[in-house]
Amino acid sequence: MFEGSITALVTPFADDRIDEVALHDLVEWQIEEGSFGLVPCGTTGESPTLSKSEHEQVVEITIKTANGRVPVIAGAGSNSTAEAIAFVRHAQNAGADGVLIVSPYYNKPTQEGIYQHFKAIDAASTIPIIVYNIPGRSAIEIHVETLARIFEDCPNVKGVKDATGNLLRPSLERMACGEDFNLLTGEDGTALGYMAHGGHGCISVTANVAPALCADFQQACLNGDFAAALKLQDRLMPLHRALFLETNPAGAKYALQRLGRMRGDLRLPLVTISPSFQEEIDDAMRHAGILL
């Protein structure tokens, strides 16, 4: 079971190419700071604007650099079932510990279509699958009943990344799927409540910028020390908010640039975060104690 603070990695660019050195260094820093796991090529990794070869390159660099020290859950989603299967096969051949599969975006399939999508991917996989429910990006929500059906019929499906922000979901999903279902939130701001509802961890954007604090927060939750977790949440909450003032990962990349970790380059149609919001991110990083 995946647990704790699992970083949804940004993809560093330099001159519109993958910055391999910056990606390697980011992975090393994440592991040194205590992150429990890594997710390359998800939403935060700008996967929609990566070519197939770039997608594979990012996954391979992350796995090679991590070298088994922490699990790597490779983003392998697509609105094309066939393409998602190809990404899954690449990830398992590259040595990924699991794959993250987003609900099909743009196509707007029915609940039956969602079920068949995951069933086909499951049949092609030999490693754990985490279902990624993010209706704000995909325009469809995976119903709890559909999720339970997928879990029951697809032996490689082990859990969910829930990015709905709805704190009813973890309890409903646990009741529908059972205690062995891996509950991961994708919303940093509500992670404390999610963990109190029985969650196991967070696939986190903020952990790109504050990996040690996010790891400590998750460890406190896993230990049942919610008083300590609340203190850390109060340090992190302004940063959770500020990083999403404009479309993710613009805020996270700006923050990493301010920390000297990489360039802040984004790929169109995403653009650099507005100057007024940059100031808010700076203030939030100072509040968290990660920027002087």
From Swiss-Prot:
Where, subcellularly, is it found?
Answer: Cytoplasm
Record keywords: Allosteric enzyme, Amino-acid biosynthesis, Cytoplasm, Diaminopimelate biosynthesis, Lyase, Lysine biosynthesis, Plasmid, Schiff base
Task: Show the active-site residues.
Answer: 132, 161
CDD domains in the record: DHDPS
Q: Which residues bind pyruvate?
A: 44, 203
The pH note for this entry is: Optimum pH is 7.7.
Name this polypeptide is given: 4-hydroxy-tetrahydrodipicolinate synthase
Tell me the lineage of the source organism: Bacteria, Pseudomonadati, Pseudomonadota, Alphaproteobacteria, Hyphomicrobiales
